[in-house]
Amino acid sequence: MIIKDYSEAKKIFLHYNGSYFHMQREEYLEQYMKFNISKKEERKWLKEKVEKILSTISEVKNINLKYDKYWNILYILTETLEDNHLLDKTISAFEKDLKYLDIFSINMILEMIHDNKKIWKNFKKKLKKIIQNNDISKNEIISKEQNKLKGTQFLTEDKVIKKYREILSKLQS
């Protein structure tokens, strides 16, 4: 079935960041597949979404919202799209935001990149240089915004620092 108005398909696809798994889990995959969208069109939509988020990320002041935007972008770029140009732009934006993010968020972003071995290999040197060139010693360890989230109440500053040191050692190796 080919439908000329793809707005519903695009809405579903982007809501799940292109993840068929998540569409299936919430019972939207069958509905989405009826639109018969090409992979090329899906890639275009994902690139547009990443570009849109990147264009506004510097305006976001709330640490939790900023982290969510990075998580959203990195999920797309590490799980679905793997676009090195957009990943490079994302890492450059991340570098500018380092002074605003808490160490918990920085660590989570680095771990997300680390989980994709191919991307980690391609961007490890750049990430290492970024971390070395930025003093984050004055950054909060766990921001007030992050501390309000479910699940973070069990985190201690010591645990966050320990995890951050672990990811730093992976950058060094």
Please describe what each predicted stretch is:
Residues 2-18:
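N-terminal "cap/leader" segments of large eukaryotic alpha-helical scaffolds
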Residues 3-4, 33-48, 54, 76-89, ...:
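Alpha-helix capping and inter-helical loop/turn segments
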Residues 12, 22-37, 66-80, 102-116, ...:
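Amphipathic alpha-helical elements of HEAT/ARM-like alpha-solenoid repeat scaffolds that form extended
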Residues 14-18, 55-62, 91-99, 132:
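HEAT/HEAT-like alpha-solenoid repeats
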Residues 15-18, 75-79, 96, 111-115, ...:
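Positions within ordered alpha-helical repeat solenoids
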Residues 20-21, 62-64, 100, 136-142, ...:
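Charged, low-complexity interaction regions
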Residues 49-53, 102, 130-139:
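Amphipathic alpha-helical segments within extended alpha-helical solenoids and repeat-rich scaffolds
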Residues 139-169, 173:
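Eukaryotic acidic, Ser/Thr-rich intrinsically disordered low-complexity regions
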